[in-house]
Structure formats: structure tokens, C-alpha cells
Amino acid sequence: MIVYNQALTEKVEYMLDKLSIRGYTLWENVQGRGTSTGVPHLGTHVWPEINKSLLTVVEDDKVDRLLEAVKKIDNINEEVGIRAFVWDVIKTV
């Protein structure tokens, strides 16, 4: 799962294309706040920024490359915000 400020949408889409990651589910207008840094993204008058969240299932050999690409985006845009989370998928239907 990748959660990111909507301002990073083009960068995230480009990253997925470059890594040949085609399938995903996208949620828009995702509210939240980081655990230690950054401002809340609540879509309100006081905190107007808002996130998107993207869920994709990728092969094991793509996980590290995906995480490295997310980290690269974050390093360039630390104040904007992007995070990636990894779970093991045991089975799918």
C-alpha cells in the first residue's frame, strides 16, 4: 500500500509505469496524519491537504525496487509526504 499527498499523483503514476506495475486499486480523498512529522492531511479549511491511497500486489522481486522508488520520491519531496507499507499476500482468488 502506498499513501501519498495527492500532489504526488503524477510522480506515483510515472513510478508505477517505470516499474511495470499495472494493477492497483486507488482510494481518493484519504484523510490522515503521519506518526511523527508533517501536517495533517484532512481536506479541511485548517488542514486543506488530502491524500490518495493505492493498493497493489507485486511479485517479490519488485518489492525492493518499489520501496526504493517511493523513498526517492519522499527524499525529493519530504514536506509533501509519501509512505509505503508491505504485507505478505498468502493467497488470492
Regions found by a protein language model. Give the residues of each.
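Positively charged, small/polar-rich N-terminal and surface patches that mediate targeting and assembly
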Residues: 1-93
